[in-house]
């Protein structure tokens, strides 16, 4: 049975007991390069990785008010707090990935007339620093976890050109505390996305990798990378594209990587 049909069946079962939360919401994501689709099997440049956690989704109504979207929890890529969007398929240039593709965030909202979407790319603090060994899906993916102090990689993405490449892992850094008792992080590095033109049921959220790594040279034959370290100069440009001040880890600018299609 097609996965999308299973998603709709799960949404229907979710809504049988959801009181007024009876509006199915399905938000599709797609990877692009300068606006055109890109995948693991693309001719260079090709995608080598694109996975990220989404939390706190909300829809904007016609009166300018934001309304929560509740995650559907029947899917392996979501729990009640986060969804894992996975746009790589383990093929081609994504040899270090997985065959599973999770391209849609699925949930329900209260009935309404909506145009506008916002969400956070990141894991909420309490979950980010919980024990990953006892976490259930989608927080049990070891590829998405650093270590107990920093927690999860909120975003991991990579591109390969004909003879070069670049990858980036975004997550909290400068975290302090002990195992199970992290008290805070100097650079939270969570990414706030607001898309006022998003129309539920019609729009797709595009993540443009060319915009993300625009400050990196893909022709110098020297692969680059960024692991969110405060001393990594290679992080300054992609963090800026995400609207994050690399020095503080705070959202201080307007992101340009995520857009509406």
Short names for language-model regions:
Residues 1-7:
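Bacterial N-terminal signal peptides that target proteins for export
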Residues 7-8, 157:
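General helical structural elements
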Residues 14-17:
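C-terminal motif of bacterial Sec signal peptides marking the signal peptidase cleavage site
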Residues 20-261:
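A short, solvent-exposed, low-complexity linear motif enriched for acidic/polar residues
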């Amino acid at each position: 049975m097609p996965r999308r049909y299973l998603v709709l069946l799960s949404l229907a079962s979710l809504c049988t007991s959801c009181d007024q939360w009876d509006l199915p919401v399905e938000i599709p994501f797609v990877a692009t390069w300068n606006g055109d689709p890109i995948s693991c099997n693309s001719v260079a440049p090709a995608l080598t990785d694109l996975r990220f956690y989404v939390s706190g989704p909300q829809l904007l109504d016609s009166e300018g008010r934001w309304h929560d979207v509740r995650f559907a929890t029947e899917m392996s890529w979501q729990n009640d707090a986060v969804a894992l969007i996975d746009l790589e398929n383990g093929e081609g240039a994504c040899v270090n990935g997985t065959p599973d593709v999770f391209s849609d965030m699925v949930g329900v909202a209260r009935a309404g007339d909506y145009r506008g979407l916002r969400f956070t790319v990141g894991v909420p603090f309490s979950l980010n620093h919980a024990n990953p060994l006892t976490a259930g899906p989608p927080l049990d993916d070891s590829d998405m976890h650093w270590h107990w102090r920093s927690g999860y990689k909120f975003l991991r993405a990579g591109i390969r050109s004909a003879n070069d490449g670049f990858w980036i892992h975004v997550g909290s850094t400068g975290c302090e505390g002990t195992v199970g008792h992290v008290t805070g992080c100097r650079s939270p590095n969570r990414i706030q996305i607001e898309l006022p033109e998003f129309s539920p049921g019609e729009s797709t959220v595009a993540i443009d990798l060319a915009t993300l790594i625009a400050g990196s040279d893909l022709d110098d034959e020297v692969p680059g990378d960024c692991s969110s370290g405060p001393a990594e100069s290679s992080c300054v440009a992609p963090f800026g594209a995400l609207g994050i001040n690399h020095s503080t880890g705070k959202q201080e600018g307007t992101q340009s990587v995520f857009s509406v299609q």
